[in-house]
């Protein structure tokens, strides 16, 4: 049975979030959390939080055993972009795009 956790409007660009995602797809949940714990990236911390939420959902809502869970899929989608303005020379302005992401973590029990 698939269990998912959705984290929306995370203030990090999808490009930065996709790096650690490729490393942990298909891993056992325990191994994935250990890998994420030792990655020196902000994205790894965000993904670990979402993965822990998916595990808690599986354990509490569906009474699944945590030892049997695997990361089936992780989807990173682009969220809304905040547009900002930085003053430049000669009265001009440069646009700054502050991107956000939506993160969906799907875990599945392997038998």
Swiss-Prot record:
One of its GO terms (cellular component) is cytosolic large ribosomal subunit. Pfam families: Ribosomal_L22 (PF00237). CDD domains: Ribosomal_L22. GO terms for biological process: translation. Keywords: Ribonucleoprotein, Ribosomal protein, RNA-binding, rRNA-binding. GO terms for molecular function: rRNA binding; structural constituent of ribosome. InterPro entries: Ribosomal_uL22, Ribosomal_uL22_bac/chlpt-type, Ribosomal_uL22_bac/org-type, Ribosomal_uL22_CS, Ribosomal_uL22_sf. Gene3D superfamilies: Ribosomal protein L22/L17. This protein binds specifically to 23S rRNA; its binding is stimulated by other ribosomal proteins, e.g. L4, L17, and L20. It is important during the early stages of 50S assembly. It makes multiple contacts with different domains of the 23S rRNA in the assembled 50S subunit and ribosome. Part of the 50S ribosomal subunit. Belongs to the universal ribosomal protein uL22 family. This is Large ribosomal subunit protein uL22. It comes from Desulforapulum autotrophicum (strain ATCC 43914 / DSM 3382 / VKM B-1955 / HRM2) (Desulfobacterium autotrophicum).
């Amino acid at each position: 049975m698939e269990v998912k956790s959705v984290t929306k409007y995370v203030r990090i660009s999808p490009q930065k979030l996709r790096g650690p995602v490729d490393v942990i797809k298909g891993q056992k949940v325990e191994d994935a959390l250990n890998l994420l714990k030792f990655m020196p990236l902000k994205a790894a911390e965000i993904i670990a939080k979402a993965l822990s939420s998916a595990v808690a959902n599986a354990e509490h809502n569906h009474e699944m055993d945590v030892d049997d869970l695997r990361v089936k899929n992780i989807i990173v989608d682009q969220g809304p972009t905040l547009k900002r303005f930085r003053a430049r020379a000669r009265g001009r302005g440069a646009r700054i795009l502050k991107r956000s992401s939506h993160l969906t973590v799907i875990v599945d029990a392997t038998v």
